[in-house]
Design a protein with these regions (language model features):
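Residue(s) in the substrate-gating loop at a strand-loop-helix junction
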Residues: 139
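Conserved glycine-rich cofactor-binding loop
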Residues: 15-16
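Conserved glycine-rich Rossmann-like NAD(P)H-binding loop of the short-chain dehydrogenase/reductase
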Residues: 29-45
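The beta1-alpha1 cofactor-binding region of Rossmann-like NAD(H)/NADP(H)-dependent oxidoreductases
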Residues: 59-69, 101
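SDR active-site lid
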Residues: 172-241
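Substrate-binding pocket helix/loop in short-chain dehydrogenase/reductase
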Residues: 95-96, 103-105
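Active-site helix of classical SDR
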Residues: 119, 155
Length: 287
């Protein structure tokens, strides 16, 4: 799907960081953008600069009941929906024993259930046109988990698994799915981290992580403007990858994860295969 034609985007969490950079890049490219944010007042400058092509919508990405209304507003204003970006996100820092059930569920609402509802609302329009791109802003933490960020990684792992199934289901309708897996980028993400209550058991073991996460704000390697430009170009291109590690750290770290994972499978393959019935016939599956 190579196209220079005007596309219409929905971008959640577009008030800052990746979302803001994406909105600015898409608008600068001549596209229409619906910026879905909790505080529309903060988007007045963008709405004024792009009054014909930018629609600001009040939206909480965790509110699954609001998804259909956001898509309807987009179609009413621009007549089509080409690109959906589930970008809204945040993180909770703390050991498994320190993070509460409420904190874990809130991240699942934000990173899985909210995006799932918005995708379901958007798909009829995309399927109807047999065209569309769904961009899921994941993380390198959606492929490799780190101590102290279990809740965040769990929610991103869930998003990735759900999205991989989605990609196979919607491909026959001309709809693509792109999972973006950034490393650290110079956004306000780290400034907005939520830290769980610190227990004596993990105070020392996770102290370096907490300090690193808190101290990284403003010195991250990744440039969100460059990243946004890449995503906009991909949305207009013929081919997109299912997964795009974004940033040098993500490329290096995830390459190592895949190499070590394959080596581990091969190391234990003989034992693993011995669990089958001796006379079992290998299954033939549709996928």
């Amino acid at each position: 799907m190579t196209t220079d034609a005007t596309q219409t985007w929905i971008i959640t969490g577009a008030s800052k960081g990746f979302g803001r950079a994406l909105a600015e890049a898409a608008l600068a490219a001549g596209d229409n953008v619906v910026v879905a944010v909790r505080n529309p007042d903060g988007m007045a400058d963008l709405a004024a600069e792009y009054s014909d092509t930018c629609l600001v919508a009040r939206f909480d990405a965790r509110d699954t009941h609001a998804a259909a209304g956001l898509v309807s507003a987009t179609l009413d204003r621009f007549g089509r929906l080409d690109v959906l970006v589930n970008n809204a996100g945040r993180a909770v820092i703390g050991a498994v024993e320190e993070v509460s059930d409420a904190q874990l569920r809130d991240l699942m609402d934000l990173h899985l259930f909210g995006p799932a509802a918005l995708v379901r609302a958007a798909l009829p329009a995309m399927r109807g046109r047999r065209s569309g791109t769904i961009v899921q802003m994941s993380s390198q933490g959606g492929r490799v988990a780190f101590p102290g960020v279990s809740a965040y990684c769990a929610s991103k792992f869930a998003l990735e698994g759900w999205s991989e199934s989605l990609a196979a289901e919607v491909a026959p309708f001309g709809v693509r799915v792109l999972l973006v897996e950034p490393s650290r980028f110079r956004t306000a993400f780290n400034a907005g981290l939520e830290f769980s209550a610190v227990s004596d058991s993990y105070r020392d073991t996770l102290a370096p992580l907490r300090a690193d996460m808190a101290g990284a704000d403003g010195v991250q390697e990744g440039d969100p403007v460059r990243a946004a430009g890449i995503i906009v170009r991909l949305a207009h291109s013929e081919h997109v990858p299912l997964r795009l590690p974004l940033g040098s750290e993500a490329v290096e770290r995830l390459s190592g994860v895949y190499r070590r994972g394959l080596a581990e499978v091969e190391r234990w393959a003989e034992i693993a295969r011995s669990a089958d019935f001796d006379d079992a016939v290998s299954a033939v599956r549709p996928v």
